[in-house]
């Protein structure tokens, strides 16, 4: 089904606004994926804040022109699904995890921080823990010396308390 000019402009405007807010774009070929599998992928993506779209490549190229994702315009050929996310790793994680279980989804590349990523770059990005996990790990590292000091002081107080009880 072909789109008229106003519908094409609406699609371009929508994708342009997605690209302006997003940190990451992941591009994957979806040839041969069943509707049920594609629905699972979309539900998983939506739950993680990733916007997945199947777009005409010419419209996608126009939408990302002048943005940080312009570096992957040459990769936009064939039947592709585009994943935009505001979280730096969410789109890569969703697509890479799905590609592990479904060999028909082929990651073609992506972009992050204005740089084009190849397949290995997307997979490496997917292996990075999420922002929340990294913040939790940082808090744990910061709390570790404090909690160790508290344990040592508690042990000293208990030992001193035993010494006073034995003297009495």
Swiss-Prot record:
Single GO molecular function: structural constituent of ribosome
Protein's GO biological process: translation
A GO CC annotation given for this chain: large ribosomal subunit
Keywords (A to Z) from UniProt: Ribonucleoprotein, Ribosomal protein, RNA-binding, rRNA-binding
Keyword Ribonucleoprotein: yes
rRNA-binding is among the record's keywords: yes
Organism domain of life: Bacteria
Coiled coil: none
Entry-linked Pfam families: Ribosomal_L10 (PF00466)
Entry-linked HAMAP family: Ribosomal_uL10
Entry similarity comment: Belongs to the universal ribosomal protein uL10 family.
Function: Forms part of the ribosomal stalk, playing a central role in the interaction of the ribosome with GTP-bound translation factors.
Subunit organization: Part of the ribosomal stalk of the 50S ribosomal subunit. The N-terminus interacts with L11 and the large rRNA to form the base of the stalk. The C-terminus forms an elongated spine to which L12 dimers bind in a sequential fashion forming a multimeric L10(L12)X complex.
Protein name listed in UniProt: Large ribosomal subunit protein uL10
Taxonomic source organism: Paracidovorax citrulli (strain AAC00-1)
Gene (name only): rplJ
